[in-house]
Amino acid sequence: MRHYEIVFMVHPDQSEQVPGMIERYKTAITNANGQIHRLEDWGRRQLAYPINKLHKAHYVLMNVEAPQEVIDELETTFRFNDAVLRNMIMRTKHAVTEASPMVKAKDERRRDVAEDLDEEEVDDVAEDSEE
């Protein structure tokens, strides 16, 4: 089986359907003895240019190992699903399991905010003890 990176963008009005779509695609891959190495739901993001007069879309990234038949099935599903604005399926040489730069940046921001909050709590406690 080969390794693939799949990115698809969903119409922003259909964002509530994304978890169900992901579940269907995961089931199709695992039923064909495939593996999902990485699955990231990036949420709504700004588009680089308008698509069908839309400026935002819901992004999903998957790195999978699956037979060609499943990939063909996913491609057909993407093509005939009106909620999917764009999709890209690329074959990769190896399984990619590490977090994408998008997720790494998000985690760093969360960590920075958490550290800032911890520092503020320490400052608040110090001020309270001085009074």
Swiss-Prot record:
A UniProt-annotated Pfam family: Ribosomal_S6
Keywords recorded for this protein, A-Z: Ribonucleoprotein, Ribosomal protein, RNA-binding, rRNA-binding
Comp. bias (Basic and acidic residues): 104-114
Tagged with keyword Disulfide bond: no
Region (Disordered): 97-131
GO cellular component: cytosolic small ribosomal subunit
SUPFAM superfamilies: Ribosomal protein S6
Single annotated GO MF: small ribosomal subunit rRNA binding
Keyword Membrane: no
Feature: compositional bias, Acidic residues: 115-131
Biological processes annotated in GO: translation
Entry-linked HAMAP family: Ribosomal_bS6
Function: Binds together with bS18 to 16S ribosomal RNA.
NCBIfam families, per database record: S6 (TIGR00166)
Family: Belongs to the bacterial ribosomal protein bS6 family.
Protein name: Small ribosomal subunit protein bS6
Organism: Proteus mirabilis (strain HI4320)
Name of encoding gene: rpsF
